[in-house]
Amino acid sequence: MESWSAPEVPALPGRGPQLRLYDSADRQVRPVSAGDTATMYVCGITPYDATHLGHAATYLAFDLVHRLWLDAGHRVHYVQNITDVDDPLFERAARDGIDWRDLGAREIQLFREDMAALRVLPPHDYVAATDAIAEVIELVEKMLASGAAYVVDDPEFPDVYYRADATVQFGYESNYDHETMLTLFAERGGDPDRAGKADELDALLWRAERPGEPSWPSPFGPGRPGWHVECAAIALSRIGTGLDIQGGGSDLIFPHHEFSAAHAESVTGERRFARHYVHAGMIGWDGHKMSKSRGNLVLVSRLRAEGVDPSAIRLGLLAGHYREDRFWSDDVLSDAQTRLQRWRRATSLPTGPDATDVLARVRTYLADDLDTPKALIALDAWCTEALDGGGSDVTAPKTVATAVDALLGVALPVE
């Protein structure tokens, strides 16, 4: 599937340092040991609603990873999926009286426009679940053959399930206890009470055909994929084993990332699906959790329609650390707009303070678990000195503007 147009990433002098990120499985910040080509799989949207700031914050975090890898001299193979066959999509389409495919296509296009406006680098492979049915079927067949999966004893709906105990390491990614797993499994799309399952935590791999639902033929009967297996199949088919980063929002730690990793591991025999499991925090609005039920979603497209500069949206989200749950507010946006104006004024000056030190510090801060708050403060200090008339380096304003563009994805004027 087509993604969106890529913004140009300008080159900076020298190379950035090795990236260090917090790994949810190991619960510590450690180096990301990528090869010449760094690989990353980030879970994409379920296209039944517009992109809100929680989505945007997640994709901005991994956009920074992408940019820092490029700055460190890596090629990047980035894969993102689209969960375009799932219950929330069908439910919203039925509510609105629209075909689920048309709803998905509309929201995917809006997502593309939002990502392009925010200057997010597109994935190398942008894959809809409906375009990966063959890969899913192949993976489920392998799990059935190995005993990692089974068909429930239900003549009407013979669904295929994954055995949660199929790998001895199951649970390592989330580090959650059994009770927490069960709670989150029920809250986040699981079906612990499904009759015929061997264990409450066993996860759906293939949902047998139901009336009114799309389905595809398979050796184990017509149906459609479960959620977690889609990502395992797409990642394995596009990247293979030895994935550097599996990423997404913190709400995907369990069950989604735990199971997608386990599905892949049960087939490949690898101990770890990914070397790093990286998760972004949640975004709330004005002191409350952002949710559809509250009706307080802040949509990127709505902000753009109101005339908000996408670079200000980007700076507002980057003002907080990516792993922290944090709140968006009018004050956050106002502060970001003020910061953007100051940066643009400073980098438009004919001269400024030498940029060597600020470039080195910004690179160092970002490479240390994407510490954007420190990076932004370092840039603020340079801009303040420049606006106060300090420095006589004629190349510095352009160097700083180029660094902000290349590393943070924020476009500033460069003469």
UniProtKB/Swiss-Prot annotation:
Keyword annotations from UniProtKB, A to Z: ATP-binding, Ligase, Metal-binding, Nucleotide-binding, Zinc
Uppermost EC category: ligase
One GO-annotated biological process of the protein: cysteinyl-tRNA aminoacylation
Cofactors required: Zn(2+)
Motif ('KMSKS' region): 289-293
Pfam family, one: tRNA-synt_1e
Cofactor-binding details, from the entry: Binds 1 zinc ion per subunit.
Signal peptide: none
Any one cellular-component term (Gene Ontology): cytosol
Residue ranges of the motif 'ERGGDP' region: 187-192
Catalysed reactions, semicolon-separated: 1D-myo-inositol 2-amino-2-deoxy-alpha-D-glucopyranoside + L-cysteine + ATP = 1D-myo-inositol 2-(L-cysteinylamino)-2-deoxy-alpha-D-glucopyranoside + AMP + diphosphate + H(+)
Residue sites binding L-cysteinyl-5'-AMP per the record: C43, G44, I45, T46, T58, N81, I82, T83, W227, G249, S250, D251, I283
Binding, Zn(2+): C43, C231, H256
GO MF: ATP binding; cysteine-glucosaminylinositol ligase activity; cysteine-tRNA ligase activity; zinc ion binding
Entry EC number(s): 6.3.1.13
Subunit structure: Monomer.
Stored PANTHER family: CYSTEINE--TRNA LIGASE, CYTOPLASMIC, CYSTEINYL-TRNA SYNTHETASE
Known role: Catalyzes the ATP-dependent condensation of GlcN-Ins and L-cysteine to form L-Cys-GlcN-Ins.
Protein family according to the UniProt entry: Belongs to the class-I aminoacyl-tRNA synthetase family. MshC subfamily.
Protein name: L-cysteine:1D-myo-inositol 2-amino-2-deoxy-alpha-D-glucopyranoside ligase
Species: Mycobacterium sp. (strain KMS)
Protein's gene: mshC
